[in-house]
Amino acid sequence: MFALRIAALVAAVLATGLTAGVFYAYAISVMPALNRSDDRTIVDVMQKINVVIVNPWFMIAFLGTVAFGILAAVLHLGREHRATLVWIAIALALNVIAFAVTAGFNVPLNDQLAAAGDPAQIADMAAVRANYEAAWVRYNVIRAVVHTLAFLVLCGALFAAGVQQGKAEAAGSAQGVTAYAAPAGLGAPHAAAHTR
């Protein structure tokens, strides 16, 4: 069961880290570069990116931030895992917030950009860009920061899980030693009786 709990937790860590990394890359490279481009370039490039980004590799990581977090939380229910569960719950809440930012703001902006149509046919390209770029960049930074915080908290959860497992193994070893020593101690009076 320990292996399954750790596997779910590691999956949540990886999914969150990868998703945070994607949005971080947008924030520090993709969008600053496009900001230096003309109106048609940013509209054309972002329309294409918004199509290709919806692929299994990204969706597994993006949806996994919440799905794997829920699985890890369920597997850590119980008093003995309470410390780890607190970390997981905080990270899950952060990932849900970031997910909501994407679904509530970035995706509608992407849909709005797609609805503008073929860049070659757009009459007022500057207006399309103005209604999209600044808002999208702002919400992307927010979700990148929140996912990154969730990633750090999940790393804390992984550490806490390791500490708890170490304590459990140490306690089990101590009980084993006590159980082994008890019969030897009980045998001492019998040995003394035979010497009389």
What is each PLM-predicted segment?
Residues L18-L63, P108-A134, E169-G172:
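Interfacial loop at the N-terminal end of multi-pass membrane proteins
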